[in-house]
Amino acid sequence: MLEGIRIIEIEGLGPGPFASMMLADLGADVIVVHRHSQPMPGMPERNIIDRGKRSIILNLKEEDDLTNLKKLLQTSDGLIEGFRPGVMERLGIGPEVVLKENPSLVYGRMTGWGQDGPKSKQAGHDLNYIGLSGALWYASPAGQAPFTPPTLVGDIGGGSLYLVAGMLAGLLNAQKTGKGTVVDAAIVDGSAHMMNLLMSTQDAGLLLSLIHI
């Protein structure tokens, strides 16, 4: 379904690579930029998440390699990166630079807390995001500490899936208008959004089967 769509993934952890894996599963041509200091691609922990992707090794602190990445981005439809806010800008490949050179590109950003806000510069983990968003409430028996669910809830549910939705919407918009966009996907925001139905149903007094009631 996404044949002919090229996505560049800057190697990272968890939600970003999982999102690009989903796009590759749908037919997109995903090229992973592996860091020069890391082992060669194909390590066991990445065998699944790198399925269907091509790869290239670049040192983004070297001018020649950075130039090669920019050339790739000029002929691509999308980019996915999961660095902390400001890192891509310091490398010289932030949205303003990249979208100036390729105005139709969809620039996907995967973070825990978003690009701005009081926690944007802080590290975080799945449990932090689902705790502050209210998603951990769902696994809270009355009078007991909440059970810790798998990291699928925040990282994948609130992160990867929302990034994929944003990327697909951005790609459709780019096809119609020729204009790219920045998709700012924050795990805490996605996790909170997933709770809309449960929270509203609980508020209406209709959710009577939660284990914490």
Regions found by a protein language model. Give the residues of each.
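Conserved small-residue-rich beta-alpha loop and adjacent elements
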Residues: M1-Q38
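A structured beta-alpha segment of the ubiquitous adenosine-cofactor-binding alpha/beta core
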Residues: I49-K100
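Rossmann-fold NAD(P)-binding glycine/threonine-rich loop
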Residues: I93-N102, R109-H125
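Conserved N-terminal glycine-rich FAD pyrophosphate-binding loop of Rossmann-like flavoproteins
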Residues: M40-D50
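Active-site loop/turn elements of alpha/beta-hydrolase fold enzymes
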Residues: R35-H36, L60, P85, G112
